[in-house]
Amino acid sequence: MEQKNLDQIIRETVARYMKHSLIVAGNWKMNMTVREGMEFLEKLGPVDGKVMIFPPYTTLAVLAGEFRRRGITYGPQNFHYKDSGAYTGEISLPMIRELGCGCLLVGHSERRSYYNETDEEIHKKIQAALSEDFSVMLCIGENLDERKSGQWKKVLRKQLLEDLEGLSRDKIPYIQIAYEPIWRWTPCAPRS
């Protein structure tokens, strides 16, 4: 995909979504048991607007019906782009479909950092998810060094270009971009 075309698509997508209501998304990471997840949902109360939750696999499987009943979009924090195989610890798109998931989290900074997930792998996941009619929440972000050195725009552009390479224009509405400034969320970063 040409640089100019992708830039134009990104601008159009951002402009279109800015006209819509806000999306509130929560990644539960490796937190919340099924019981804790249910308690959280009870405290949350009725949902007004678009809410997305990405719980751990065990909680996802058990609370899928509760998420649906409350109108919450839900999905896994990770998945494999192949439908089956000897991939210990992974979950496939057919397995995810059985749970009624609507959106898949892709490219989270912890997946990129702790598991060395590359933009090439993220690209494969996005292509697989979109080909199976899932929507995707793509996480992009820069670390503190990239931020301080003024390279943050270059980093974000690279992630977008490589993660979305070759994507047809008709798939853009099925992608939400989540900007996660990694430097703000590390344990050492001051919180405000």
Where would I find each of the regions flagged by the language model?
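Active-site loop-to-helix "anion-binding N-cap" substructures in soluble metabolic enzymes
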Residues: 2-192
